[in-house]
Amino acid sequence: MDDALHALSSLTAKKRTTTYKKVAVPILDENDNTNGNGPNDIDNPPELTGNGFLFANATLNRVKNRLEGKKAPEQNHNNGKDRSENSLPTQLISNLYDGGEELEKSEVKDNSYSEKNVSSSFTQTQRIPVSIQQDKVFNVPIHSVNDGKPTQLIKEDGLVNETSQALKTPLTTGRPGATQRIDSSGATSQTQPIKSIEPQSQIITTSSNHSNALSPKIPIIPTELIGTSPLFQSIQNRGPDTQMDVPPQTAHDEDKTQAIGIPQATHQEQKTQIDTVAQTLQDEVPHTLKIREIQSELASEDSKREKARNVEYKKPQKPIPTKKFFSKESFLADFDDSSSNEDDDIKLENAHPKPVQNDDELHENKSVELNLTDETRINEKRVPLLSSYANNLKREIDSSKCITLDLDSDSDEYGDDDMDSIKLSKDESVLPISQLSKATILNLKARLSKQNQKLSQRPNKSKDPKVDHNVLLNTLRKASRKQILDHQKEVIETKGLKLEDMAKEKEIVENLLEQEILRNKRIRQKEKRREKLEENDFQLNAHDSGSDSGSESSGFALSGNEIADYESSGSENDNRRESDSEKEDDEIILKQKKSHHVKHIINESDSDTEVEAKPKEKADESLPKRIAINLGHYGDNIGEDTDKFQETNVLDTQNIEEVMAERNTIENEVKDDVYVNEEADEAIRRQLIDKEKLQLKQKEKEHEAKIKELKKRGVTNFFEMEAEESEDEWHGIGGADGEGSDDYDSDLEKMIDDYSKNNFNPHEIREMLAAENKEMDIKMINKILYDIKNGGFRNKRAKNSLELELSDDDEDDVLQQYRLKRRELMRKRRLEIGDDAKLVKNPKSSAFFESMVEDIIEYKNPFGAEEEYNLDITSTATDLDTQDNSINVGDNTGNNEQKPVDQKNKKVIISEDFVQKSLSFLKSNNYEDFETDKELSRIQHGNDEAIEDLYTLKQNSSIKSFTNSQTDSTTSKTVNTIIDLEKRPEDEDEVENGDTSLVGVFKHPSIIKSFASRTDINDKFKEGNKTVKILKSYKTVGSSKASITYMGKTRKLIAPKRKTEGSHRYHHDHHNKKMKMKTKTKSNKLFESGQDSFDN
């Protein structure tokens, strides 16, 4: 007992944890005692029993029988065996409590079955979905056997004409008190989620031993999947029913079969059940058990939770963008079709009135309409919310793209145009297409114009008023201000104060400040009046003194400039005074100060003002003292102390004023003397200016009188004619004749500075100019010294100027002489190196040194002084010391010069012709013309500073070829050419040169000859290695640095052997013959040997 009650108490808490168990349901026989529901019980669902239900359990039945005092009936084991054999698979229903599996081990032995052999075969199962969200109720009438109606008519709402069938339902009889009525709402969690299966037909065949008729197989019509079909829901008095169990129906008849098709209902997932449960007749059980109410409430709560959980979100499908093409003809055709369809519909409704129907017909039509509306609702509910929302949006978008034309609905507003349009619409079928389109267009225009007029007359309520940002800002400021004030008010009230009292005090203070400002203004006005009186008195005194001294300075004259300056200065002073007074008033108002106690020191001469001021002071004293600031009830407490404090202040201020008055009197006595003199000068100046003005006015009057007299005489006509002729002759180029007009022009005099008024000190000006010149000279000297130290002049040499800012011709000549002298000095310093210099001895470094020397040479005559560098290269057939057989070079030029060969430096000399033939590619075609031009240039310009041109440098270059002992003499060319750069004797030059008178005077020693190497070339091959000597130290030559720019790898070379006289002669003749035969060959054949090379 305790275990059973404990299982019932745990029913509500652990309802969700379910297990599933297959239980066989027996097939009942017709002969069994059945207790069906009467016709009054149509509203209640069929009562179900079986091993899978809660209250059909054996243990519960035992407990119930014991409580009621009844004995448990005997169980028939044989019937149990037959029942188990013939039982069919029933619905998979979970236990509603823990420990249900143990209780169901002892299965209840239900109602007795007949011993008839009933064979049943189920070919296929049926998917029966049940909706959770549907609130409608199916009332399945079950007719008992006692009524004589063995069949029941089942009609479902989901199917109109196909789902109703005559079913023969043999009902089973149960034991009294053994069965319980189970509320459909309590079995919400007994449903089993099963994957969706395609709706299939069910065929149930039953055979009986006592029946001779064969039962036909009736296939069930497959039904559509409808999302919200109601099935077996609760009674009206009960809560929201979500029963998902199928009403158990069995077909056990010999001649009858059942084909059941139940529509499907899904809540986001298709739920199926396979359920065949036998109907039983139950005893009357009270329906007012408390546990059933609790179960119904829990089931409704669970259903709500499942609804909230099972809501799925689906993305709205984006509309596929499609281009819509609109044309005038299609639009008009659609418009005409729509208007004609509407007219036809109206005519059909009027032509076919609705027939009068009876009450029965009305009732049947209503049921049919209800079924149709249920179907449409089901179809509508199948569509998810998001997809429907997306479809609505698409419709709105499509409608916005189209043009909507609203017709005038009011019949009273139709005019003649509308009537014409109606006539046109009637005659549209008669008119051709072209006329039809024009008519419709005109009709549309008329309608739209009327519609626009109506819209313009109506107030635009839909349009939002324009939002002004300034208004919004003002509202925000007001709101924020109000919020701040409220906050301040709360803070002040918390402190125990009141804003009203504070506002009153603030008003009082503001009123007092305004009174103070007004009082200060009055005081200032009084002071201005006094100042004006003083100025008037001062002007009268000055005028009197000026009249006395005017006679003394009558001979003193003033210019027109002084008069104009005085007038302008007077106007400026007046303007300044006015502006100062205005500024002072503004400052008083802004600063809100108290009264300024201005002290005026009155001289003895101003006795009248003192007399006027005294009665005013007395009148002020006689007036009662006005309280400037009303302190309220606090003023009485401060009164006595303030009187004492004022008395002490008055005594102190009187002492201070006496001391200040004494000082001011002494200062004023000194200033008055100066001021009187200045006043006298100004008065004299005014008088002179007035006199000058009178004189100018008199001159103008006299001039005008002269012009009037000339006009009367007729002289003006003659003058006009002359003026016209002069203008026509010169066209205004000559300008005005004669002196200028005598009229005074003040504007010009203002523009011109009058230095007579300025007092300049010439000594100060001279000192300033001298100081400026001195500074400039110091800067220039410092610059020159800096350039001398750091080589600034050397850098400026390329610009051919020292930047001394000297522009005269004489100074230019001096600069040229300076440059010449400087170059000569540099040249001498470089030539002092002499023959012992290592740079000159080394042929590789000598070229670099020569380039440095060439930087100093002036290029005045680059081609004129070549003759002194013409080298006499002769071929020696005998000893090198002999000069008899020397061949003179330069036969074309006529200047054949012979040079003695130094005995110390033994050299091999060859002729110039040989070198020219061997190096023909370096020689130009017009060589003779070039030589003649060179001679003429030498005679004309002289050879002060000669330099060789590119042609002579190439011509006088040296070529060396080294021969190995293994190579043939024919293939290898042993040509040793060297430049003879020795100085020629002056005697031979004078004898052989016929032009000594022109050239000899300007002749200078050659620069390049002094750097010629006097050593033998073969000396450096004595050791067998070609070496280069490197100097780590360097020598400065004319502020420049000498260095070695060539580095060579050491290589072993065989020095050439000195040849005899016979070999030299043979070698020379042999080469001459070869070169004569090969004059027309190409120049590149000179370098057939890879060992030939140029070397300095």
From Swiss-Prot:
It comes from Saccharomyces cerevisiae (strain ATCC 204508 / S288c). The modification Phosphothreonine is found at T609. The keyword Nucleus applies. Pfam families: MRC1. Required for normal DNA replication. Phosphorylated in response to DNA replication stress. Phosphorylation allows it to mediate the activation of RAD53. The modification Phosphoserine is found at S144, S409, S411, S434, S605, S607, S801, S807, S911. Residues 547-560 have a biased composition (Low complexity). It is found in: Nucleus. Residues 68-85, 294-315, 611-620 have a biased composition (Basic and acidic residues). One of its GO terms (molecular function) is anaphase-promoting complex binding. Residues 591-600, 1065-1083 have a biased composition (Basic residues). Phosphorylated by MEC1 and RAD53. Keywords: Coiled coil, DNA replication, Nucleus, Phosphoprotein. This is Mediator of replication checkpoint protein 1. GO terms for cellular component: chromosome, telomeric region; nuclear periphery; nuclear replication fork; nucleus; replication fork protection complex. Its main location: nucleus. Interacts with CDC45 in S phase. Present with 721 molecules/cell in log phase SD medium. Residues 488-542, 652-716 form a coiled coil. The keyword 4Fe-4S does not apply. Residues 336-346 have a biased composition (Acidic residues). GO terms for biological process: cellular response to osmotic stress; DNA repair; DNA replication; DNA replication checkpoint signaling; maintenance of DNA repeat elements; mitotic DNA replication checkpoint signaling; mitotic G2 DNA damage checkpoint signaling; mitotic intra-S DNA damage checkpoint signaling. Residues 68-90, 166-200, 294-316, 336-365, 527-620, 724-743, 881-903, 1058-1096 are annotated as: Disordered. Residues 181-200, 881-898 have a biased composition (Polar residues).
